[in-house]
Amino acid sequence: LAAVSVDCSEYPKPACTLEHRPLCGSDNKTYGNKCNFCNAVVESNGTLTLSHFGKC
């Protein structure tokens, strides 16, 4: 089983779209889309990881 991951190399970004493609973080928080999630990953210095796609 491959680990679930998202490429956040292009982040952080100053603004995210309102696109609704939820991701569940390792903090058990649902992020609205990849942009919101990746900005949080950068802020966490890489401690936040993707738990799974979809709502937590």
Curated annotation (Swiss-Prot):
Cystine crosslinks: 8-38, 16-35, 24-56
SUPFAM superfamilies recorded: Kazal-type serine protease inhibitors
Glycan attachment positions: 45
InterPro entries xrefs: Bifunctional_prot_inhibitor, Kazal_dom, Kazal_dom_sf, Prot_inh_Kazal-m
Cell membrane keyword on record: no
GO cellular component, one term: extracellular space
GO molecular function, one term: serine-type endopeptidase inhibitor activity
CDD domains referenced in this protein's UniProt entry, alphabetically: KAZAL_FS
Residue span(s) of domain Kazal-like: 6-56
PROSITE patterns given in the database record: KAZAL_1 (PS00282), KAZAL_2 (PS51465)
Domain of life: Eukaryota
Pfam families for the chain: Kazal_1
Key words of the record: Disulfide bond, Glycoprotein, Protease inhibitor, Repeat, Secreted, Serine protease inhibitor
Site description Reactive bond 3, residues in chain: 18-19
Subcellular localization, as worded in the UniProt entry: Secreted
Domain writeup: Avian ovomucoid consists of three homologous, tandem Kazal family inhibitory domains.
Protein name: Ovomucoid
Organism placement in taxonomy: Eukaryota, Metazoa, Chordata, Craniata, Vertebrata
